[in-house]
């Protein structure tokens, strides 16, 4: 099944629990000092809302995208429970019309559903939609994640490496770029020792 289809993700999210939990991604939370009240933030492939809700709680004006209506319904419930307002939109990021220089912040956490060359259009969209001076916060898996099998896609070609991220964002100011292994505990679908890569970069 094509992992970019709504049906694939609806089937995954159609359970009572939040499959990635309701707490924000740990790397994102470690960057809390970069979140400013009133900044416009885009949460890419946000799923059940854990990251967009956290951003909104810190005063960001959040636009959250996901392809799955079921995930978005759960995200709206989470936002209501936590008392925040978020602009949720159902969208296939591979053909979404990315706006020009719209956001102060883009959050891209484990968005490795798209293989090459489809992901190139996704990266191009991220580059396009950030304002000059805007921040990208990204976490993904490296190819070694295939050995751990504790989350993420089953294909190494979907994974990120430091050279690949430098190829995509080498003309930006890279504040943080690190490959590492760590234990992830983010719901039932991201649990266990994992091969990770973190990026914080500023668009010139």
Where are each of the predicted segments found?
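Conserved class I S-adenosyl-L-methionine
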Residues: 1-36, 38-47, 144
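Conserved SAM/SAH-binding beta-strand->alpha-helix loop
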Residues: 68-70
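Conserved SAM-binding strand-loop segment of SAM-dependent methyltransferases
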Residues: 82-94
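A short acidic, Gly/Pro-enriched loop at the edge of an enzyme's catalytic core
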Residues: 94-105
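A short, conserved alpha-helix within the catalytic core of class I
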Residues: 113-126
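Conserved beta-strand signature within the Rossmann-like core of class I S-adenosyl-L-methionine
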Residues: 133-141
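Short alpha-helix
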Residues: 157-178, 197
């Amino acid at each position: 099944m094509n992992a970019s289809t709504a049906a694939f993700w609806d089937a995954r999210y159609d359970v009572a629990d939040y499959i990635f939990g309701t707490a924000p991604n740990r790397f994102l939370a470690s960057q809390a000092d970069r979140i400013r009240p009133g900044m416009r933030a885009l949460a890419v492939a946000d799923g059940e809302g854990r990251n967009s809700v956290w951003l909104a709680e810190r005063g960001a004006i959040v636009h959250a995208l996901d392809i799955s209506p079921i995930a978005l319904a759960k995200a709206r419930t989470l936002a209501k429970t936590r008392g925040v307002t978020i602009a949720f939109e159902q969208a296939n990021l591979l053909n979404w019309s990315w706006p020009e220089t719209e956001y102060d912040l883009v959050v891209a956490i484990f968005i490795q559903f798209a293989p090459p060359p489809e992901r190139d259009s996704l990266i191009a969209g991220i580059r396009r939609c950030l304002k000059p001076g805007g921040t990208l916060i990204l976490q993904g898996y490296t190819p070694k994640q295939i050995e751990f099998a504790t989350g993420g896609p089953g294909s190494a070609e979907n994974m990120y490496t430091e050279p690949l991220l430098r190829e995509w964002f080498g003309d930006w100011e890279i504040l943080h770029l690190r490959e590492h292994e760590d234990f992830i505990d983010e719901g039932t679908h991201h649990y266990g020792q994992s091969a990770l890569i973190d990026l914080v970069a500023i668009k010139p």
